[in-house]
Amino acid sequence: RSTFEITSFAQKIQPNNELEPIMRHGEHPRILQFRNTEEEIQSLADLVSSFKSSHYTSLGIICKTESQAKELAQKLQPYTDCISLLSNQSSTYIKGIIITSAHMAKGLEFDEVIIPQADDKNYHSSTDKSMLYVAVTRAMHKLTLTYSSPLRICRFL
């Protein structure tokens, strides 16, 4: 279901012999670095805006934890009102733009995925590596990872 480029990117994080790439090509995954958290949040709002003017119908903003997803949903609120938080308390799944955790995203797929805070402080353990892999493999067509200085990009990328 994911493009060849996204599948290849996922294999670098955590090799999986059962993950067979389909021969559908697309954009290479992007890793965007920002000077600070505020700049990263503004860029996430810009990425959401770009998504809304694209032909894609589903966007997953996948955080490592549910608390990070809730915090990010609040920070993005001033920029857009069309984002839904998918959490343990959610009773329904709403299509469109979803912010959720990697755990809650398991089994879902999105046309486009954004993974914020993809830094070495946030993703450093073997469990984190698995969560990152799950988040990356939710993307079917477009994948963007973001992080802020002074932190470094996560060691698994």
Predicted segments with their positions:
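Short acidic-hydrophobic, aromatic-tinged amphipathic segments that line or gate anion-handling sites
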Residues: 30-40
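Conserved RecA-like helicase ATPase core segment
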Residues: 1-32, 156-157
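Core RecA-like ATPase module of SF1/SF2 helicases and allied nucleic-acid translocases
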Residues: 1-4, 17, 38, 42, ...
